């Protein structure tokens, strides 16, 4: 029996190195795991730095675009006003203008100006007599006794203007007071 035990021990000792060798061949050592982890960390840091640089470049380009937009926002409107200025200068160069030709020139210039306003979404606020006072668009300059409903427009002193839907200048109005 001793011989059998001895053979079993020898067989076990022979199997152990083979099994241990096979296990070590498939399982990475701690040093290999550390090296792989360090490589992964380096790759992730590189990816992070590239993403950070890309975001910073995007932010910088967006800021430059906003700055450019602010700088040249009025360019289109200014181009529309140049013919108006040209018309006024030509009117001043006429040596002996007649009242009729001056009136015609002013009307044409006003049409050019209105076209520029319309194209750039600059809208007039001209309340009519009897319109309800709108504090978002009208500024009451005075209250006057009138034969109409209280808090309604009696007279428009000066037109107001909107750019798109934003108030540029309120219309100045006189308002009917309560009786």
From Swiss-Prot:
GO terms for cellular component: cytosol. Its main location: cytoplasm. GO terms for biological process: protein folding. Keywords: Chaperone, Cytoplasm, Stress response. It holds the Pfam family GrpE. It is found in: Cytoplasm. GO terms for molecular function: adenyl-nucleotide exchange factor activity; protein homodimerization activity; protein-folding chaperone binding; unfolded protein binding. Coiled coil: none annotated. It comes from the Bacteria. InterPro entries: GrpE, GrpE_coiled_coil, GrpE_head. Residues 1-29 are annotated as: Disordered. NCBIfam families: PRK14139.1, PRK14140.1, PRK14150.1. Participates actively in the response to hyperosmotic and heat shock by preventing the aggregation of stress-denatured proteins, in association with DnaK and GrpE. It is the nucleotide exchange factor for DnaK and may function as a thermosensor. Unfolded proteins bind initially to DnaJ; upon interaction with the DnaJ-bound protein, DnaK hydrolyzes its bound ATP, resulting in the formation of a stable complex. GrpE releases ADP from DnaK; ATP binding to DnaK triggers the release of the substrate protein, thus completing the reaction cycle. Homodimer. Belongs to the GrpE family. This is Protein GrpE. The lineage of its organism: Bacteria, Pseudomonadati, Pseudomonadota, Betaproteobacteria, Burkholderiales.
